[in-house]
Amino acid sequence: MLTRKQHELLLFIHERLKETGIPPSFDEMKEALDLASKSGIHRLITALEERGFIRRLPNRARALEVLRLPDSIAPGLNAQKKFAPSVIEGSLGKTPPPPARPAPVATNDDTSGTVSVPVMGRIAAGVPISAIQNQTHSLSLPPEMIGAGEHYALEVRGDSMIDAGIFDGDTVIIKRGDSANPGEIVVALVDDEEATLKRFRRKGASIALEAANPAYETRIFGPDRVRVQGKLVGLIRRY
């Protein structure tokens, strides 16, 4: 999944290539996305390239090629000029969900003796990505696996937590909550936009989101930029 800004940049590049055959400049991309500096564009392009959406052509200035578009925006692309992507909402973000329908939570299934846990989408164990706001399906789990409280599940994408035994394709079970102890693995919401699965640490007054893979750097944020959305209590792996 892509963040809102990644979606916007990908579509902006695609539309510019379609109209002129020439990729936009970094200044044009910065202005289009209303970013303060070009370093933000560099990070977005790197993330899009890592996910296989674009490719930078070597030895050519401003050479970008769009390899694919997300399934959510590919249909009817020519009929719309601006895409309004889904971002984290409700208890996984800053925008409250529609009042007519409460957010799904784990519920008891009296007929089978299991607990139904909603799968809410995907979570990055790598570069942060937006979590899907809608329930995709549910898992039936034994009550002793998760204990009391409200829970949801997320599918892991990325390899930054492999040393903690969490691999790409695993499903993590998260207990909802807005606090965590140092060393616990949490779903962290960064800047009310991006969700990531990382180990929670405190560095003085700041919050550190620590990977369990030496290839990834620990990211440090001010306390007002990070909100805990729940902590890891279980993991499911299919073979």
From Swiss-Prot:
Its EC number is 3.4.21.88. Gene3D superfamilies: Umud Fragment, subunit A (2.10.109.10), Winged helix-like DNA-binding domain superfamily/Winged helix DNA-binding domain (1.10.10.10). It comes from the Bacteria. GO terms for molecular function: DNA binding; serine-type endopeptidase activity. Keywords: Autocatalytic cleavage, DNA damage, DNA repair, DNA replication, DNA-binding, Hydrolase, Repressor, SOS response, Transcription, Transcription regulation. Residues 90-110 are annotated as: Disordered. The active site is at residues 160, 198. GO terms for biological process: DNA repair; DNA replication; negative regulation of DNA-templated transcription; proteolysis; SOS response. InterPro entries: LexA, LexA-like, LexA/Signal_pep-like_sf, LexA_DNA-bd_dom, LexA_repressor, Peptidase_S24_LexA, Peptidase_S24_S26A/B/C, WH-like_DNA-bd_sf. The record marks 125-126 as: Cleavage. It catalyses: Hydrolysis of Ala-|-Gly bond in repressor LexA. It is an enzyme of class 3 (hydrolase). Residues 26-46 bind DNA. SUPFAM superfamilies: LexA/Signal peptidase (SSF51306), Winged helix' DNA-binding domain (SSF46785). Homodimer. Belongs to the peptidase S24 family. Represses a number of genes involved in the response to DNA damage (SOS response), including recA and lexA. In the presence of single-stranded DNA, RecA interacts with LexA causing an autocatalytic cleavage which disrupts the DNA-binding part of LexA, leading to derepression of the SOS regulon and eventually DNA repair. NCBIfam families: lexA (TIGR00498). This is LexA repressor. It comes from Brucella anthropi (strain ATCC 49188 / DSM 6882 / CCUG 24695 / JCM 21032 / LMG 3331 / NBRC 15819 / NCTC 12168 / Alc 37). The gene is lexA.
